[in-house]
Each structure stands twice: as structure tokens, then as C-alpha cells.
Amino acid sequence: MEKLTILLLVTAVLMSTQALMQSGIEKRQRAKIKFFSKRKTTAERWWEGECYDWLRQCSSPAQCCSGNCGAHCKAW
């Protein structure tokens, strides 16, 4: 009877550990999908007006679609 109780306890611990590990993996996978689905291409950012095309005045590289700012957005 003692062996059966110990076996059941060990089984319960192993199953709960597996469940915790599985939920952690699923959370990481969902986070990766969410991160990559938010990224837009340069063309999408330009089309939606989120960045400036070249020869437009800028104050930081993040404003330019090319990511290159020197008073005006540069093509490259």
C-alpha cells in the first residue's frame, strides 16, 4: 500500500511538472508570434504614413523609412 501511495505521488509530481513546462513553452511561442506579427516592412510603414520618404526634413533616424537622417531623410 505504501509503494502504491509513493508511486501515485511521484506520478502526480511528474504530471504537474510536465503541465507547467508545456504552458511555459506555449507562452513563449505565443509571445514570438505576437512580436513578429507586429513588425511591418518599410513599404508598409511608408504607405501608412508612419515614416518619411527621402528628401523630407527629419530630426531622428526613426522618422525616415530608410533609417538614415541627416537634416533630410537619405535614400541610403
UniProtKB/Swiss-Prot annotation:
GO terms under cellular component: extracellular region
Task: Please identify the protein, giving its name as recorded.
Answer: Conotoxin Im6.9
A Pfam family name for this chain?
Conotoxin
Q: What does the record give as the function of this protein?
A: Probable neurotoxin.
Q: Does the keyword Transmembrane apply?
A: no
Detail the disulphide connectivity of this chain as listed in its UniProt entry.
51-65, 58-69, 64-73
Q: Does the keyword Secreted apply?
A: yes
> Which keywords does this Swiss-Prot/TrEMBL entry list?
Disulfide bond, Knottin, Neurotoxin, Secreted, Signal, Toxin
What GO MF annotations does this protein's record show?
Answer: ion channel inhibitor activity; toxin activity
The UniProt family comment states: Belongs to the conotoxin O2 superfamily.
- Superkingdom of origin organism: Eukaryota
Q: Where does this polypeptide localize?
A: Secreted
Which stretch is the leader sequence? 1-19
Q: What is known of its domains?
A: The presence of a 'disulfide through disulfide knot' structurally defines this protein as a knottin. The cysteine framework is VI/VII (C-C-CC-C-C).
This protein's species is Conus imperialis (Imperial cone)
Q: Which residues form the propeptide?
A: 20-45
Which InterPro entries does this chain map to?
Conotoxin
Q: What is its main location?
A: secreted
Tissue expression profile of the protein: Expressed by the venom duct.
